[in-house]
Amino acid sequence: METSTNQINISLNNNTFPNHMLYKQYKDSGTSSALILPAVMMNVAGIPGIAANLLLIFVTIQNNKLRGSANYLLALTAFFEILHQSAHFLFLFITVSGINFINYSTALKFQLHSIFGLTAAQTSMASIAADRLLSVLFPLKYYKLNIRLYFTIHIILAFISGIWMSINAINFSNKYPTLPVTGYISDLLVLDMEIIFPFIMLLCGINILLYFFVWIVQIMMEVLIQKPQSRLLKSLILIVSIVIGGYVIGCLCKIIIDHFLNLNDIQIWTVNQFAGILINIGASAETPILYIFSSFYREAINKQLRSIFYKRTNSKM
């Protein structure tokens, strides 16, 4: 532990460690708008997303019409995105309190679940794409699947990817336990942990490719899809365009900013916040898109919201 601390101190002194200028600038500055504003922006994007994803999970559980495999996988993705976006609470607390920096190992205790969720959400999105491809390639066999076994397989795949990335984070934390970070989740994804970005890009590419195949199969084979399923597919394609688009643009921006632009690390850290906001907008888009473009989801969400507000109104009377 002492050796690792000494290595970090030497690296900081030699200006070679991630965000070393940011650390020197703000480690003893107390509360600073330069840190608080990004934390607030992340939570402004993230908190509505958490609420929307919770609502999606709840209506999926409550509504008997939302019992298809795609519906379950959408709810699963929403759950993982909640884990991901909850990371921003620590960032806000650290900056508003004026602490500004904590050790990597400490941050990981509060944000390991978010790294798990971030990775698993992408795997779950790929599962949805694979599910849609199966539904158009083998429609008769698809509707005879054992839904519990089928869904369990997708859950296991998502958990495996999330656990794998979590193990990488734990190993990195053991290697550099006292690395100072702001509590922003992207600060945990440095050096060895940058492996998460090509992994996310790979899954995004798989998503796009699978939906492209879905489109091709529908055109070439003229597969007939029931209207509700067709509307769901259109919603899913739009979700992929926005959600995956947010992740792709965010990851590409981070890679370009970190490795190709001649900026100091304070400027890099600040600009990267905008990439993070894009990712969070994408992570929050699932429920609004389903509400707008799927009549089943819109009906279920409206019913649930009326129920919530009706109960609150009665409780006040």
Give residue ranges: language-model regions:
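Seven-transmembrane-like multi-pass membrane architecture, highlighting hydrophobic TM helices
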Residues: M1-M317
